[in-house]
């Protein structure tokens, strides 16, 4: 347990930041899942509207990841890996739809 006031305050700040980071990561994961769902719906019914929806979801997810890196929630390499894996997963889902 902290003995002086500054240490107690640092504990409070660390807990506040932990909760904010947790919330931000949760929102980021939600956007990534939404992106994969949009890719699945594009696979079922390929069309301009589904493609636009997919592109919008990808842009939102990438933006959220970039902001997480900028805020220090994620390390920049971790952010780059998340973007790369998300893009690869979306392409893997979309490839069969484009070959039709």
From Swiss-Prot:
Keywords: Ribonucleoprotein, Ribosomal protein, RNA-binding, rRNA-binding. Gene3D superfamilies: Ribosomal protein S20. Transmembrane segments: none annotated. GO terms for biological process: translation. PANTHER family: 30S RIBOSOMAL PROTEIN S20, SMALL RIBOSOMAL SUBUNIT PROTEIN BS20C. Binds directly to 16S ribosomal RNA. InterPro entries: Ribosomal_bS20 (IPR002583), Ribosomal_bS20_sf (IPR036510). One of its GO terms (cellular component) is small ribosomal subunit. Coiled coil: none annotated. It comes from Prochlorococcus marinus (strain MIT 9211). This is Small ribosomal subunit protein bS20. It holds the Pfam family Ribosomal_S20p. GO terms for molecular function: small ribosomal subunit rRNA binding; structural constituent of ribosome. It comes from the Bacteria. Belongs to the bacterial ribosomal protein bS20 family.
